Amino acid sequence: MSDRAMSPALLFGFVAAYFGALLVVAWWTSRRAVEADFFVGGRSSHWALVAFGMVGTSLSGVTFISVPGAVGASGFGYLQIVIGHLLGYAVIAGVLLPLYYRLQLSSIYQSLATRFGPRSQRTGAGFFIASRTLGATARLYLVVRILHDMVLAPMGLPFWLTAAVILLMILLYTVEGGVKTIVWTDTLQTAGMLAGLLLCVAMLLAALDLTPAAAIARLAETGLSRVWGQDPMASGFWAKQLLAGAFIAIAMTGLDQEMMQKNISVRTLRGAQQNMLALALIMQVVVLLFLLLGGLLQLFALQHGLAARGDALFPAVVTGYLPAAVQLVFVLALISALFPSADGALTALTASTCIDLLDLQQRGDARSRKRIRRAVHLGFAALFMALVLVFRWIDDRSMIGLILKIAGYTYGPLLGLFAFGLLTRRAASDAAVPWIALAAPLLCGLVDFNQRALFGRYEIGLELLLLNGAITFALLWLASRPGDQGFAPNPGSMRTSAVARNEGSVATQTQTKKPR
């Protein structure tokens, strides 16, 4: 066991320096930002920058810990889901992005208002807010727990203080610039996460005295690199996983304000589509590297008789068996994986609440809008804090399974709503949509809870999302009548875009006229 553990105070110093660099980037990018830049970044982001930064947002600290930790139980089976993502990303690029750009939206749920009505917009936003709040705080909790155990607990500080410090860091660099800032900070942090991933793989290969080719051969011998599930009755069957992967990508990326707010900040539709396809390919390589890391951790655990499993394995190996420098790399990479998902969630939740629920862009003057937006931002930070403490109490062993389970219930109604709007021209009752969106997850829960009695050996896995979406679609069909409705440009969103451009123009003129 390593006796060269890095001092917690020194680790904290490096974390503080890293955060200082993020604050500098945040200050630089938000210097001339107008209020609309918080929501769509002035629609001037470069597609390559967004694609690279979205890798970090898509993965998060949960991927950094849970995906490698799950290799012992399911091998490389998670790759089935990620391969399925390719089809989902193609649907987003070919169907959803053209819709969002045609409607010129600040929030993607404004499209539901043009198709069904204002209650549907609020329902879509409400399910996104519930889903992203729970998912983001589950991700946040996992990383906060590890950072607390490694850095602040040895200094005698309580868990709640660790969570508060990290949330304060995120709040400070997102409160002004919003999307305009996080496009840049997420790029910086994704680079840090990937560098940390590669260094950890290299250090484990060295510790095991293996070349990459020899490591792959060893993983094949032990069965850890198995990908395809062959039992049709099991939840890990390959066809289920591929299909679930496609719909998870559509729902958790294409119908998610956090992920799409960066895409619709790109200058052109073509650029946004290039970003989505580039992201799809990069994700295949990055997840494969995480699975390789997980396989190496399992080999290391077998070699050293380690009892740690699941989410506890990676931190146990780093803190107990590898050189002190690797601890620093691990901590900085973990923070780099955490911040892009947490900062994007905080910004997107603020944006969706302000636009979809409060109709902020049609209210008062710019100063009052900014005051309300800041209050909402602070409110979500406080909610994040409370939920992190709840997850501390739950303390699930594998957070990625919990997050995907939550997504199956909360993204299903969104999937059904958008599918009905795109695939049919029927006129659904706007008043019925909120009730349908609530009924579908409840019916899914009944099926899930009684699946053994209903289906015998057949296990419902991630296809719960598809079932939820299908129930929503069917109920919408029953509550609709023949018609000729489609997604139409929203006059409100056009007016909002004009106001934003006007504010940006006024701000630019003011800066130009300022005396030297």
Identify the residue ranges that each predicted region occupies:
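Membrane-embedded helix-loop-helix hairpins and adjacent transmembrane boundary segments
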Residues: 2-493, 497-498, 513-516
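Long, low-complexity, intrinsically disordered segments
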Residues: 502-516
